[in-house]
């Protein structure tokens, strides 16, 4: 049985490992997050494309011109940002992201580890129900604490300025939100974040199941030394990527709703009202705008975060024992 000192040491270890993993992942995948947020926004510029309608019965063969709006894809948005705003705009929101991601991941993993200890004493140890309740509890606490920082980050990512013009920094953006919307403005999109807990639960339930399978796999048990560590590390990366990919596809619509709720001067007021309005005005496909960018960002990001976390825990636990 762990003593009070050992439990405190374990909590600090999970805080540190989670913070390091989150920071590394945020830096590497920031440009993709900016593109994803732009794609999710209702302010995404639509290109009007004109398709000629051909009438065979006319002498000229040409008829009316029919305008059709086309939503730009990932590469069009990337090209637009580079041409109009410059490469620095691909790192918009990195400041609040770095300020928030380390404590966010640290709080999440510490809460997750602590909750798992508690739920293991109530349910069958390390069962799926333990992972589900632990992930849900950790996500709820983390979302409640960190929403103001993510709100500022989203606003900064949505700000579009031409190349060379001055953009708001993190403190200026936070001050502007407070002056125009008050304290409540920092909690816009929180209901959508709570809905997104389902994604976290799905992700960790799949991840823990895959991790358990990898530990019991014949290849893992037959390997030894460096080979075993290498196999485990890359296995965890693959498990993290797969679990996040599945979870993102299932629960993605809440991300679009959250971005809409965080837009400045928005017509979107609540989670349900936003969902109805987006569906009525843009159709169900609008709920999946930016999914491709999300997948190619989140899958490597989650793999980096979880594998860095597991690696640091493994290395430091060995040294403290």
From Swiss-Prot:
Function text: Mitochondrial transporter that imports/exports pyrimidine nucleotides into and from mitochondria. Selectively transports uridine, thymidine, guanosine, cytosine and inosine (deoxy)nucleoside di- and triphosphates by an antiport mechanism. May import (deoxy)nucleoside triphosphates in exchange for intramitochondrial (deoxy)nucleoside diphosphates, thus providing precursors necessary for de novo synthesis of mitochondrial DNA and RNA while exporting products of their catabolism.
GO CC terms in record: mitochondrial inner membrane; mitochondrial membrane; mitochondrion
Gene label: SLC25A33
Keyword Ubl conjugation carried by entry: no
Solcar repeats: 9-118, 126-213, 231-315
InterPro entries cross-referenced by the UniProt entry: Mitochondrial_sb/sol_carrier (IPR018108), Mt_carrier_dom_sf (IPR023395), SLC25A33/36-like (IPR049562)
Natural source organism: Homo sapiens (Human)
GO biological-process terms attached to the record: cellular response to insulin stimulus; cellular response to insulin-like growth factor stimulus; mitochondria-nucleus signaling pathway; mitochondrial genome maintenance; mitochondrial respiratory chain complex III assembly; mitochondrial transcription; mitochondrion organization; positive regulation of cell growth
Molecular functions per Gene Ontology: pyrimidine nucleotide transmembrane transporter activity
Catalyzed reactions per annotation: UTP(in) + UDP(out) = UTP(out) + UDP(in); dUTP(out) + UTP(in) = dUTP(in) + UTP(out); 5-methyl-UTP(out) + UTP(in) = 5-methyl-UTP(in) + UTP(out); 5-methyl-UDP(out) + UTP(in) = 5-methyl-UDP(in) + UTP(out)
Tissues and organs where the protein is expressed, per its UniProt entry: Expressed in the central nervous system. Also expressed in testis and skeletal muscle. Weakly expressed in heart, liver, kidney, prostate, colon and peripheral blood leukocytes.
Domain of life: Eukaryota
Matches recorded under PROSITE patterns: SOLCAR
Regulation: Inhibited by pyridoxal 5'-phosphate, 4,7-diphenyl-1,10-phenanthroline, tannic acid, and mercurials (mercury dichloride, mersalyl acid, p-hydroxymercuribenzoate).
Name of the protein in its database record: Solute carrier family 25 member 33
Gene3D superfamilies to which the protein is assigned, alphabetical: Mitochondrial carrier domain (1.50.40.10)
Membrane topology type: Multi-pass membrane protein
């Amino acid at each position: 049985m762990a003593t009070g000192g050992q439990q405190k040491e374990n909590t600090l270890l999970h805080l540190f490992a989670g913070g390091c993993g989150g920071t590394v992942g945020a830096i590497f995948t920031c440009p993709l997050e900016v593109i994803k947020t732009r794609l999710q926004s209702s302010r995404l510029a639509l290109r009007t494309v004109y398709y000629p309608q051909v009438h065979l019965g006319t002498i000229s063969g040409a008829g009316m011109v029919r305008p059709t709006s086309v939503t730009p894809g990932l590469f069009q948005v990337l090209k637009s940002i580079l041409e109009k705003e410059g490469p620095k705009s691909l790192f918009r929101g990195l400041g609040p992201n770095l300020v928030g991601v380390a404590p966010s991941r640290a709080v999440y993993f510490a809460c997750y580890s602590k909750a798992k200890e508690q739920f293991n004493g109530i349910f069958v140890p390390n069962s799926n129900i333990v992972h589900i309740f632990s992930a849900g509890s950790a996500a709820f606490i983390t979302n409640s604490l960190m929403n103001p920082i993510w709100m500022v980050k989203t606003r900064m990512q949505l700000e579009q300025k031409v190349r060379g013009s001055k953009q708001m920094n993190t403190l200026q953006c936070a001050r502007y939100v407070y002056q125009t919307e008050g304290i409540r403005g920092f909690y816009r999109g929180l209901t959508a974040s709570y809905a997104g807990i389902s994604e976290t639960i799905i992700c960790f339930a799949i991840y823990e199941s895959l991790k358990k399978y990898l530990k019991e796999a014949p290849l893992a048990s037959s390997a030894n030394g460096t080979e075993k560590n290498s196999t485990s590390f890359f296995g965890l990366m693959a498990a993290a990527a797969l679990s996040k990919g599945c979870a993102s596809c299932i629960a993605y619509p809440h991300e679009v709703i959250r971005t809409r709720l965080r837009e400045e001067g928005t017509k979107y007021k609540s989670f349900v009202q936003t969902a109805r309005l987006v569906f009525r005005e843009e159709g169900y496909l609008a709920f999946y705008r930016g999914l491709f960018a999300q997948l190619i960002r989140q899958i490597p990001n989650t793999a980096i975060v979880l594998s860095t976390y597991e690696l640091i825990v493994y290395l430091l636990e060995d040294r403290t024992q």
